[in-house]
């Protein structure tokens, strides 16, 4: 069996394509994204969301962005919260009384909800990046900007401690974190989703 250079390159390209396709297929069910307020349960969210981007357009802090392929095929081009772009201001700020994303969603993938019903996820602290925990300086920015009483406490060593049961996942602390790279990450862990049909 004699393989030409062209034949070898075709085999190599074919193998790379199969590898890429298998990676995409393995990401299909993955949906580790933080959804905007009022998001219905994930199994119905992806089928109901038109990917129309209305929620992105009306978000005053531009915290809502489109999920990419890295978030899974089923989640691709659906809205997610990116606290690096801005916090979700449903508690304080420009959005606290309107939550236009929930009111203007044409399909009901985002449902109007009360502020006290919202839990987008939880923030996780990486002590190896946190300025206060590294003792490279004093920093309590996360505690200073957090709009939820008791979500962050300061221990006796003047270091922030996060309380998942109180955190609502607005991402205000993530956005404000001065560490580079950020010491905080917003995860969908503990997110409260709206039952569907309601």
Where are these regions (language model features)?
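Non-ligating segments of multi-cofactor redox enzymes
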Residues: 1-198
């Amino acid at each position: 069996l004699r393989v030409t250079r062209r034949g070898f390159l075709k085999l190599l390209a074919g193998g790379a394509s199969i590898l890429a396709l298998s990676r995409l297929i393995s990401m299909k069910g993955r949906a580790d994204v933080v959804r905007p307020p009022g998001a219905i349960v994930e199994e119905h969210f992806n089928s109901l969301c038109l990917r129309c981007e209305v929620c992105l357009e009306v978000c005053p802090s531009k915290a809502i962005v489109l999920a990419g392929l890295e978030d899974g095929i089923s989640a691709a081009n659906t809205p997610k919260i990116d606290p690096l772009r801005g916090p979700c201001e449903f508690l304080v700020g420009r959005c606290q009384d309107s939550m236009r994303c929930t009111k203007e969603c044409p399909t009901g993938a985002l449902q109007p909800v009360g502020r006290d019903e919202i839990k987008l996820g939880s923030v996780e602290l990486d002590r190896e990046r946190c300025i206060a925990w590294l003792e490279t300086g004093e920093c309590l920015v996360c505690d200073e900007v957090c709009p939820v009483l008791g979500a962050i406490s300061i221990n006796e060593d003047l270091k922030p401690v996060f309380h998942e049961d109180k955190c609502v996942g607005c991402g205000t602390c993530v956005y404000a974190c001065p560490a580079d790279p950020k010491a905080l990450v917003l995860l969908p862990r503990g997110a409260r989703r709206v039952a569907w049909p309601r």
